[in-house]
């Protein structure tokens, strides 16, 4: 099967003079289901549509956007697998100098606010052709949202981009129905109420059975109204009971239909059976780091019911787990093993959270009226069926393939869930670690983990004890590398000191700490901007200055010479100078240097891996 056309000559080789849908993408074109635009393009192609891809066009002129001509139906624009601002800037708002989704890892192949810029250029090139926007950037900016890089509330991206329709979430259903209806002659302006979409109406337009949340103007001027808008919208994310949401922007209305229904197992299997080339487009002469990272990985499912407050998965993929069948996964492994570059190691079998594969709610009636954002917090839902047999069978099958030497589970596990999955836990420790297990407690102080919607210290200690005991029993020299966040809303300098002392007591040391980044669409970002917990209304302490955020981070890195001055300053502020000798010595440690991925809950190589790069060889991550 050939690549999706990217040039006129590739179109002509297929005998095509015009395409039905043209995708414009901020990432390089890698024909693999781990990348959203190629997945949707192949999905439409399967259903008889002629599609093309314009990857990373030069936005400084209009000509690159005209490369494939005028589509018969519409353009579909996406910033790529990450929000373009997250991709371009560090948590300190400093410009990055690399881009894993670009050949040669080069920065600068897409603009800031790429969805907005692409839409503007497409409208300039073909004013009368509809432009549909989607992807993580559009999804998480679909309502009025706080923008960290401008430190203000911005309008829905649909208004700023002046697009015709916004598709949010995993868009296979909405994209296909839109193309089919337009293909039958319907005007996009007449297609309203399609699940998983947002559109604009004039004020006064009559809508039934909807929820109106505080308007853009209120959100921009009143932080409590912003928190209220977030709280109301986040409770409508269950596709079975979510209502249409309306948010006024001046004299117009943003209308957001309920989320798309989840895919059934057979539909998931059919997606991953599409004829992908499983390679970057041959026009690229340099390697694409994101492709190198995932080319030996397998997506087993999508969705996550953890509901971490700093993570965007729930607002994008949803909390309902959509799993592939084992035979579908086995078919992909069989294909992978035949690749000439495959060397025997599968780098990952998983999703956003690997040990959620095959899990579901045990009460369909309860599920369809549920408004919980997490099935695990504040305590595990009594309706959740936690059965690890299906996941264990999948891992066994993967290891048994001829030509497979090792299977990693590097997309992360929830260690609180592992307490009810003893067989899976044993499998993980015995066969799928290979040296270091990266775990993501994010914090260990209860008042902070509660705000993060994460398990607390006691749960982590039980997991750590079990991991060490099982590793010793197996004679495996395995260790733990903890992932931690500094500067999270509600976290004070004293909390970070308490965390640092807990790590010392547990014999753990970190080499990288993630400074909290307020990314659009998350609960933690709402906390950061509003200064309150949107669920309880409790006022929160929020570290906003670069100085304090730097001090929080330094308290966990006292063994590094470059952080010594900041550690001493932090201890002086807390009146705890006597702890200097404790924090400024290396101490016992299981950890080695492990670079943390540069986003929390935003970067996505594919449906199922929200954190993308920097995992050392032979390492896995647990949440």
From Swiss-Prot:
<feature type="binding site">
    <location>
        <position position="308"/>
    </location>
    <ligand>
        <name>[4Fe-4S] cluster</name>
    </ligand>
</feature>
<keyword id="KW-0004">4Fe-4S</keyword>
<dbReference type="InterPro" id="IPR006638">
    <property type="entry name" value="Elp3/MiaA/NifB-like_rSAM"/>
</dbReference>
<protein>
    <recommendedName>
        <fullName>UPF0313 protein Ppro_0556</fullName>
    </recommendedName>
</protein>
<feature type="region of interest" description="Disordered">
    <location>
        <begin position="594"/>
        <end position="623"/>
    </location>
</feature>
<dbReference type="InterPro" id="IPR024560">
    <property type="entry name" value="UPF0313_C"/>
</dbReference>
<dbReference type="InterPro" id="IPR007197">
    <property type="entry name" value="rSAM"/>
</dbReference>
<feature type="binding site">
    <location>
        <position position="304"/>
    </location>
    <ligand>
        <name>[4Fe-4S] cluster</name>
    </ligand>
</feature>
<dbReference type="GO" id="GO:0005506">
    <property type="term" value="F:iron ion binding"/>
</dbReference>
<dbReference type="GO" id="GO:0051539">
    <property type="term" value="F:4 iron, 4 sulfur cluster binding"/>
</dbReference>
<feature type="binding site">
    <location>
        <position position="311"/>
    </location>
    <ligand>
        <name>[4Fe-4S] cluster</name>
    </ligand>
</feature>
<dbReference type="Pfam" id="PF08497">
    <property type="entry name" value="Radical_SAM_N"/>
</dbReference>
<dbReference type="InterPro" id="IPR022946">
    <property type="entry name" value="UPF0313"/>
</dbReference>
<dbReference type="InterPro" id="IPR023404">
    <property type="entry name" value="rSAM_horseshoe"/>
</dbReference>
<dbReference type="GO" id="GO:0003824">
    <property type="term" value="F:catalytic activity"/>
</dbReference>
<keyword id="KW-0949">S-adenosyl-L-methionine</keyword>
<feature type="domain" description="Radical SAM core">
    <location>
        <begin position="290"/>
        <end position="560"/>
    </location>
</feature>
<keyword id="KW-0408">Iron</keyword>
<dbReference type="Pfam" id="PF11842">
    <property type="entry name" value="DUF3362"/>
</dbReference>
<feature type="compositionally biased region" description="Basic residues">
    <location>
        <begin position="614"/>
        <end position="623"/>
    </location>
</feature>
<dbReference type="InterPro" id="IPR013704">
    <property type="entry name" value="UPF0313_N"/>
</dbReference>
<comment type="similarity">
    <text>Belongs to the UPF0313 family.</text>
</comment>
<keyword id="KW-0479">Metal-binding</keyword>
<keyword id="KW-0411">Iron-sulfur</keyword>
């Amino acid at each position: 099967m050939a690549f999706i056309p990217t040039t006129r000559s590739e179109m002509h080789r297929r005998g095509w003079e015009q395409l039905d849908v043209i995708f414009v993408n901020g990432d390089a074109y890698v024909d693999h289901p781990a990348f959203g635009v190629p997945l949707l393009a192949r999905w439409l192609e399967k259903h008889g549509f002629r599609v093309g891809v314009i990857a990373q066009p030069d936005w400084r002129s209009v000509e690159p956007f005209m490369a494939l001509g005028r589509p018969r139906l519409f353009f579909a624009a996406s910033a790529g697998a990450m929000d373009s601002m997250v991709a371009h800037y560090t948590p300190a708002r400093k410009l990055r100098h690399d881009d894993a989704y670009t050949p040669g890892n080069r920065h600068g192949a897409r603009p800031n606010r790429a969805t907005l810029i692409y839409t503007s250029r497409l409208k300039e090139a073909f004013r009368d052709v509809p432009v549909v926007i989607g992807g993580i950037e559009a999804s998480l900016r679909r309502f009025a949202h706080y923008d960290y890089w401008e430190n203000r509330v911005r309008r829905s991206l649909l208004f700023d981009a002046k697009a015709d329709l916004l598709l949010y979430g995993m868009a296979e259903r909405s994209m296909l129905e839109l193309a089919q209806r337009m293909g039958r002659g319907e005007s996009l302006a007449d297609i309203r109420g399609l699940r998983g979409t947002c559109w604009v109406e004039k004020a006064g337009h009559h809508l039934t059975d909807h929820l109106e949340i505080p308007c853009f103007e209120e959100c921009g001027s009143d932080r409590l109204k912003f928190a209220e808008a977030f709280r109301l919208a986040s409770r409508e994310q269950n596709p079975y009971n979510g209502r249409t949401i309306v948010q006024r922007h001046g004299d117009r209305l943003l209308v957001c239909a309920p989320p798309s229904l989840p895919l059934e197992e057979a539909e998931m299997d059919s997606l991953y059976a599409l004829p992908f080339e499983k390679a970057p487009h041959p026009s690229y002469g340099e390697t694409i780091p994101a492709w190198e990272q995932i080319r030996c990985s397998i997506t087993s499912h999508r969705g996550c019911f953890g509901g971490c407050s700093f993570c965007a998965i729930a607002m994008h993929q949803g909390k309902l787990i959509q799993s592939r069948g084992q035979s579908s996964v086995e078919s992909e492994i069989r294909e992978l093993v035949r690749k000439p570059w495959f060397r025997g190691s599968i780098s990952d079998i998983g999703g956003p959270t690997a040990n959620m594969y095959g899990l579901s709610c045990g009460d369909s009636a309860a599920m369809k009226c549920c408004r919980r954002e997490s099935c695990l917090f504040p305590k595990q839902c009594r309706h959740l069926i936690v059965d690890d047999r299906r996941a264990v069978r999948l891992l066994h099958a993967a290891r048994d393939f001829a030509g497979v030497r090792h299977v990693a589970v590097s997309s992360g596990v929830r260690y609180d869930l592992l307490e009810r999955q003893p067989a899976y836990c044993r499998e993980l420790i015995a066969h799928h670690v290979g040296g270091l297990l990266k775990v993501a407690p994010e914090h260990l102080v209860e008042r902070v983990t509660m705000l993060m919607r994460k398990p607390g210290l006691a749960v982590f200690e039980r997991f750590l004890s079990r991991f060490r005991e099982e590793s010793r029993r197996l004679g495996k020299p395995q260790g733990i590398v903890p992932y931690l966040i500094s500067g999270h809303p509600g976290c004070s300098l004293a909390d970070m000191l308490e965390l640092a002392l807990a790590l010392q007591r547990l014999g753990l040391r970190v080499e990288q700490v993630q400074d909290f980044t307020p990314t659009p669409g998350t609960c933690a970002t709402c906390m950061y901007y509003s200064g309150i917990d949107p669920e309880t209304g409790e006022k929160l302490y929020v570290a906003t200055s670069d100085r304090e955020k730097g001090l929080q981070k330094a308290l966990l890195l006292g063994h590094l010479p470059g952080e010594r001055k900041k550690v001493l300053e932090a201890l002086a502020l807390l009146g705890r100078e006597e702890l200097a000798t404790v924090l400024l010595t290396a101490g016992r440690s299981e950890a080695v240097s492990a670079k943390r991925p540069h986003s929390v809950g935003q970067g996505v190589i594919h449906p199922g891996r929200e954190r993308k790069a920097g995992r050392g060889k032979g390492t896995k991550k647990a949440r």
